[in-house]
Amino acid sequence: MAKFIIYPAIDMRDGKCVRLVQGDYNQETVYGDSPFTMAKSFAEQGAEWIHMVDLDGAKAKERMNHEHVVKVATELDVNVQVGGGIRTAEDIAYYLDRGISRVILGSVAVNNPAFTKEMLQKYGGEKIAIGLDARDGYVATEGWLETSSVKAETLGQELARHGAEVFIFTDISRDGMLSGPNTEAIVQLAKATGKQVIASGGVSSLQDLDALRNEKQNGIAGAIVGKALYTNQFTLEDALKEES
């Protein structure tokens, strides 16, 4: 079984590293001026993957902070997965052609499943991750500004049938709250789809990571960690030490 992977997160807005609370653009804290410097620090601490989100792109519905993502992928010895503002075949090709390991489709997976299936067929389920950001079980889109009538599990099952291998599940109510992840909902999605699910939102302690890691046999393949690292709840080194 593949090992449980920790993904330190870098959320970018105006070229800076920021964190939002529950995706609220008005509740922003800036943690650094350079995504590259932040990524370098994560890589030096042993990260194998870095999760990068283009918040400007998510809102504007087009790529905005892409040059920072490409710099990290090409100049550091890490795998990068990126989400935010990826809407077109050209966006996907732009990133994958420049050494980014995995592209996350979020809003477009809800709004245009046919396109998403086409991209899964073209690039395969390891390169195209499906980002399911849920509010009370329903998928939210457009930088979380809108909630759809689509259930996360239903969409997950449909896309799994068409080649999706990796899902990233975010419980919006937990994001940036340091309140602990919604392990139950993540396991439920993994069981419904039979695929790997990466947990995102709410990780606040090494105990939270242990709880997720203990569900590895149930399909939880990793965890994205953001605010907990930036507010020094624990170090990335400590989190990676237990990675297995």
Swiss-Prot record:
GO terms for cellular component: cytoplasm. Belongs to the HisA/HisF family. InterPro entries: Aldolase_TIM, His_biosynth, HisA_bact_arch, Isoase_HisA-like, Isoase_HisA-like_bact, RibuloseP-bd_barrel. Pathway: Amino-acid biosynthesis; L-histidine biosynthesis; L-histidine from 5-phospho-alpha-D-ribose 1-diphosphate: step 4/9. The active site is at residues 11, 133. It catalyses: 1-(5-phospho-beta-D-ribosyl)-5-[(5-phospho-beta-D-ribosylamino)methylideneamino]imidazole-4-carboxamide = 5-[(5-phospho-1-deoxy-D-ribulos-1-ylimino)methylamino]-1-(5-phospho-beta-D-ribosyl)imidazole-4-carboxamide. It comes from the Bacteria. Its EC number is 5.3.1.16. One of its GO terms (biological process) is L-histidine biosynthetic process. GO terms for molecular function: 1-(5-phosphoribosyl)-5-[(5-phosphoribosylamino)methylideneamino]imidazole-4-carboxamide isomerase activity. This is 1-(5-phosphoribosyl)-5-[(5-phosphoribosylamino)methylideneamino] imidazole-4-carboxamide isomerase.
